[in-house]
Amino acid sequence: MKNLLLICLLVSLVSCQGNAQKAKETKTYAVQKSDAEWKAELPEMAYYVLRKAGTERAFSGPLNDNKKTGTYVCAGCQAPLYQSEYKYDSGSGWPSFDRGIDDNLEYDVDYKIGYPRTELKCNKCGGHLGHAFNDGPRETTGMRHCINSAALNFIPADETP
């Protein structure tokens, strides 16, 4: 009876580990700075979003309503992330895109709110951008990249090098 109880306990412990977030390998990014350097260089909200994986309030970011033609780049390292033709109004309160410039995006999984979500990061500096959801426009990719304005800078098409 003791052995059966012990086996049941071990099985339940192993089962609980199934949903636990596993330790991740440390990735080396092309752009590396100390936390102090990021904090000194970035505006407060950009630092909070990019470096601490925060989220700005819905409808508070200036790029949510931007309709200009151009490129959205990482506010931390200026890597091109999104083209304006892929931006659409999702009604979520954050800039939304149906796709990005894949070579510059990193897809990760986070469990910060208790269930898995696809986190989007800049592949050059590791900055947190937002999350990807599969509730985007069906006529294109079906994806919604829900991105914090504070994580982006916008470069108008007529200023692109």
Describe the residue ranges of each PLM region.
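A short Gly-Trp-Pro
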Residues: 29-30, 39-73, 79-161
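C-terminal motif of bacterial Sec signal peptides marking the signal peptidase cleavage site
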Residues: 13-15
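Positively charged n-region of N-terminal signal peptides that target proteins for export
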Residues: 1-5
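Sec-dependent signal peptide cleavage junction
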Residues: 17-37
